[in-house]
Every structure is written in C-alpha cells, then in structure tokens.
Amino acid sequence: MPSSLKGLGQAWLSSSSMALSACCSVSAWQKRLPVLAWLPRYSLQWLKMDFIAGLSVGLTVIPQALAYAEVAGLPPQYGLYSAFTGCFVYVFLGTSRDVTLGPTAIMSLLVSFYTFHEPAYAVLLTFLSGCIQLAMGLLHLGFLLDFISCPVIKGFTSAAAIIIGFGQIKNLLGLHNIPRQFFLQVYHTFLSVGETRLGDAILGLVCMVLLLVLKLMRDRIPPVHPEMPLCVRLSCGLVWTTATARNALVVSFAALVAYSFEVTGYQPFILTGEIAKGLPPVRVPPFSVTMANGTVSFTRMVQDLGAGLAVVPLIGLLESIAVAKAFASQNDYHVDANQELLAIGLTNMLGSFVSSYPITGSFGRTAVNAQSGVCTPAGGLVTGALVLLSLDYLTSLFYYIPKAALAAVIIMAVVPLFDTKIFGMLWRVKRLDLLPLCATFLLCFWEVQYGILAGTLVSTLFLLHFVARPKTQVSEGPVLILQLASGLHFPAIETLRDIVLSRALEVTSPRPAVLECSHVCSIDYTVVLGLAGLLEDFRKQGVSLVFSGLQAPVLHTLLAADLKGFQNFPTLEKAEQYVRQELGMEPYNVCEDSVPEHKVTLLTA
C-alpha cells in the first residue's frame, strides 16, 4: 500500500509539474498577453506607421464620439469617456493589429434603448456587459455567437442604420420635441417639418455633401508607388490625409462658422453647448442611483436594464469579432476569437470605472487604421492619448459645434451599414433565408431585442427542422438500402423509423434493409432505443436489419447497449452481400467500377 501511494503521489506531482510548465511557457503567456509576441520585434518603422495610423483614427473618433453620445441619449462627454479605454487595454490583450475599440453607432442605439438616457444606467450596463463578456471568454462560450446567423445580423444592422439615420433628421433640421420611438419619431418629424430651422438645414446638408465628396476623393486615390514623381506622391498623401480626417475637418469648419455668427451676436444654429471639462473621475460604477422620486437600488436597476443585459454584450461581441475576422482575412493574419472576448470584456469592465458606456469594435475606424498602414495594436496608444488631450484642453471649443454637423457625421457613418445587396443575394442563393432577415429587419423597428430574438428563433427553427428531418437516400430493390446523408440525433429517430417501416415492413412482402451510417458521428440514448425498436420490428417480420460504415464512437455505443440482433459491416457492399446471401439470392460481387442497379430517390422528409 505505501508503495502504491508513493507511485500515485509521484504521478500526481509529475502531471502537476507538466500542467504548471504548460501554463508558464512562453507560448502560453503570449497567448494570454499577445503584446509579448510582437513587442520584442518592435522597430522604428513600425513606430512611424503606428503613430500615423493612431493620429488618423484619433481625428476620426473625436467627432464621432461626440455624435454617438447624442445617439445614445447621453451628454457629449460620455462619448469621449468611452473612446480611450479600449485604446489602452487592446494594446496588451488584442490579437488584431487593425481593430479599434470605442463607441459605435449600433452600440449607441442599443444604449439609448435600455438606459433611459440616464448616465448611471449606461455605466452600470457597461460594467455588467464587461463581466458577462469576460465570463464568456473564460468559459469558452464564444460558440453561442454562432447561433446568430448572417441574415439576422444583416437584418439588424440594416434596420439600425435606418433607425439611427432617421433619428438624426431632427438635429439636421433643427426640430424640437421629437419622440425617440421610431414610429412616433417618423410621424412627429413629418408633422413638424414646417418648423425646420433654415440655418441648421443648410449647414447639415453642406456638411453631408462635403463628407461625401471627401470620401469619394479618398476612394479614388490611385496606389502610390516609389517610381512616381515626388510631387504626385505628396499630392496623393495630402488628399488622403484630408479625406481620412474628413469628420474632424468638417466638424471644425462647422464650429468656425457657428463661432463667427456667435461673435456677431446672431446664432442660426443649435449648438452642442457646455461639455464637462477635464478627464473623467475614476470611481466605482454606480450600483444605485438617486432619482427625483427616490433611490433606485441595484436590483431594481438590473430589472430595468432587462433584455439589454443579454442583447448589449452579445451584439458587442458579435460586432467586434466580425470586424476582427474580416480584417484578419483581408490582411492575411489570424485572430483568436476567445482572446478577443477577453479583451472586449475587460475593456468594458475597466471602462465603467471612467464613466464609459458599452463599446465594441468599429468597422469604419478599423478601416481607417488598416488603410493608414498600422503595424501593431500600439497605434491605439496614440489614439487614446489624443482623446485624453481633447478632454483636458479642447472641451471648451466643443461648445460651438452645431448639432446639425454632428448629425451629418452620424448619417454618413451609418449609410454603409444598410446592405442593399443582401436581399438580392439571398433571393438567388437561398430564398428561405429571407425569412429571418425580414423578421429581424421589420421587428427591430418596434423593439431591437424583439427583432434579434425573432430572427434568431426563425434561424434556430430552420436548424432544428434540418436536424429532425435528415435527408435520406433510399435505394429500392430486393434489399432496401437507406443512406443517411446527414447526422442522426434524437429528434430524427422517429422520422427514420417511419421511413424504414413504410419502405421495408409495411408493404405486401416485407424485405430486409441496410442502414448505411458512415455520416453519423454520434448518437444518444434516444437513438439507441429507436434502433433497438427497429431491430425488434424486423425480427418479428422474419427479415434482417443490418448496419454498415459505423464510425468507431457510434459502434462502441451500440455494442455497449448490447442490442439483440445487431450486426455491422465495414462497407455497404459487404452488408448488402450478406443480406442477399441470407435471402438465398445469388452472391453479390461488386468490382471497383460497378454500381448497384437501384432506383435512387432523395427524400427530404
């Protein structure tokens, strides 16, 4: 006994030391802290490119952050509070060199739905979303995102683009007292169109035209080559820089126009107004809030957030990982989806301590980052520093930014979110996928969570129907040969049973059958019971039911169940030959290039 205990202890120590060495290996540390993989190779060339990219993204995110705070129904400074935490956290934890985390149009829309325009609710939602996202990363639950199909995502983003864009019409036209619910918003906007402020409308339209022209200019800049004349390269660089920083330039132009009118004593525009100066205070997220009618407890706040605690973290993860994978594929590198969950989860958790609202990966700013030639996530340090500098020194200047200019920035940012091609593509490829797309798209105008839930439910029903009604290829002849074209799970066993019984036993002359199961990789207890029942039915009729091509795990399960009359053959030919011999028919010899002469039908039950 002592020797066995000693051996057991040595084995435990050996396995523990191996596990510890695996956890402490360089590759393990690099996986959890990706910065350790690229930092030792960092160069001056990378520093230059990262600085340019970080500056470009910073000039884009500052006006966008102010605008997205308006979409979220929060004071403008909360957009800037949300724009810098991700820059610093992602440098250490992110696996994509291109992704930039920060406020986005879609997340701002979700925040406006669930936080009642109350900053305390928004900050608490950030903290709880971060906890949920971090837990999903630690528990490797990222696969749950796979159940939200592409048509659902496209339906949601297209609806969000319309909701966000139309929601800014009131600021573009200078209208007041417009409700935030979409249908009421449409009604009251058209009802109040006669109250349009001419100054806001003209400035907003001019800003939109300028943004569009600058975007088209950037899209048409030819690739720069070293053999080009210096003046051509400089011109292309100047145009590209101007077009990339178009949001900042257009907002600055609008602010200068507004300031010029302010000096004369006449102001035709609605301005952003006072913004809290300085950096945000570092404090614990609010777990209760004092309202006009009393103090709201943490439990009550969680109840008020409701479905937002599921929708916001899931959509945040989905958007960020989709952006990361898209640019990783485009630029030929790999991202770790689970590590991305950890990065965005920790970003939101830490961001809640500086009054951030929930953030995610931004497609538009990530595109700017990639096109600027960023080499590592270190470009985010420059972006974050620029946002902090603007908070510390520029907030007094933000007073003069017209709301119409910010509305123009938002509208031009969300236009690409509406995917007009997806409807035609699905019509050509698989029309059934239009159902979850349209369900999501239409119901999102009522409530966002209903749209996402309906689309996901429809997609899941399609998936469950496919599992419960597997495609089955049946070969008719003296021997019924049934080939499962997909897996076999417990919802499908009754369908399989009905097909086999109706084709083999419920006929004038019962015949034997062969189940070809090479595509079945796993079964459960319900399937075992169903197959046992089939074997019993065949035995009562005096004919055989045999199996072929069972994979090792499935064969092991069926052998462990000790089914009476169970027989398995390695190939379909051998199984069919055995049954034919049992019937007293001539032996069936199959050469390599011969095919059994059966009438084949495809059943899609």
From Swiss-Prot:
Transmembrane helix keyword on record: yes
Subcellular localization: Cell membrane; Lysosome membrane; Apical cell membrane; Basolateral cell membrane
Major localization class: membrane
Domain STAS: residue ranges: 479-582
Molecular-function annotations in GO: chloride channel activity; chloride:bicarbonate antiporter activity; secondary active sulfate transmembrane transporter activity
GO cellular component, one term: nucleoplasm
SUPFAM superfamilies: SpoIIaa-like
Domain of life from the UniProt record: Eukaryota
GO biological process: oxalate transport; sulfate transmembrane transport
Signal peptide limits: none
Extracellular-facing ranges: 1-50, 94-98, 144-146, 218-249, 325-340, 395-397, 469-605
Reaction catalysis annotation: hydrogencarbonate(in) + chloride(out) = hydrogencarbonate(out) + chloride(in); sulfate(in) + H(+)(in) = sulfate(out) + H(+)(out); oxalate(in) + chloride(out) = oxalate(out) + chloride(in)
InterPro entries: S04_transporter_CS, SLC26A/SulP_dom, SLC26A/SulP_fam, STAS_dom, STAS_dom_sf
UniProt keywords, alphabetically: Anion exchange, Cell membrane, Ion transport, Lysosome, Membrane, Transmembrane, Transmembrane helix, Transport
Similarity comment: family membership: Belongs to the SLC26A/SulP transporter (TC 2.A.53) family.
Known function: Sodium-independent anion exchanger mediating bicarbonate, chloride, sulfate and oxalate transport. Exhibits sodium-independent sulfate anion transporter activity that may cooperate with SLC26A2 to mediate DIDS-sensitive sulfate uptake into high endothelial venules endothelial cells (HEVEC). In the kidney, mediates chloride-bicarbonate exchange, facilitating V-ATPase-mediated acid secretion. May function as a chloride channel, playing an important role in moderating chloride homeostasis and neuronal activity in the cerebellum.
Name of this protein: Sodium-independent sulfate anion transporter
Organism expressing this protein natively: Cavia porcellus
